[in-house]
Amino acid sequence: MHIVHTIAELRQALSSSAQPAFVPTMGNLHRGHLSLLKQASTLGDCTVASIFVNRLQFLPHEDFDSYPRTWQADCDALESVHCDILFAPREHDLYPEPQRYKVMADQVLASKLEGSFRPGFFDGVCTVVLKLFNAVFAGKPKGFAVFGKKDYQQLKVIEAMTKQFALPIDIVAGETARDHDGLALSSRNGYLTAQERLKAAALYRQLLSLSQAYQTLRGDKQVAAWCLAAEHNATRRLTELGWQVDYVSVRRRVDLEPPIDSQGQPIAKDSLVVLAAAKLGQTRLIDNLEF
């Protein structure tokens, strides 16, 4: 694996690649990240991972300074899945001066759900992703970038940004990797205490229960009313189990709008996703499930 730190070094390393496949990360890698790398290896002619903890997507009270940096373990993990290039820029490599120009994420898509609890988060994500795309794909006729469905809203925002800027990059969605009890793998799971970890799979179980109950519906006209009741019930159950719930919300997969069409009619089945964010102790977890 070739490790590079500057954009110039990266472009030199990619000089013979016509279609790179890229997986951006913030490090502290787990099996979910590695599954995205394996997926990427089937797409392009060169597999690239990045490790960069992006200051712009952290709010002042969040965990930028304490976010786990596990460099050697990450390098070993990337070697194990035969990653070709690791791009590990230092902050001054991506932000050589204060970042006065930023990508403003589409507010229709980015201001809801995560965006309502983490204002500015998606602007920070889009800004660094566009910088990374420019570093990896400059001069390339085509490329691939793999993002996990676990960060579902982020995936949709990146898809929209890539389309808006007409970038020659296919955004590929990777399935969420889960632990034995269903908990979505996340770098922040390490913040959970042993007792909290035993309780953490309840978030996924509520989403799974909701999706299974949905299968009993007969006719699209029930969808809108059912969703409201299901969201309320899942929130209540999680609260009873000691969670502090930010949201449990059923949305259309395509645009994360409520499950009704422009005329106010319920939309067809099999095109929905339920998204949730909740805090257990001091650890905020997110998850989602398509159905």
Question: Could you describe each region identified by the protein language model?
Answer:
Residues 232-291:
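Phosphate/ribose-recognition catalytic cores of enzymes acting on nucleotide-derived substrates
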Residues 2-243, 251, 282, 289:
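Nucleotidyltransferase catalytic core that binds NTPs
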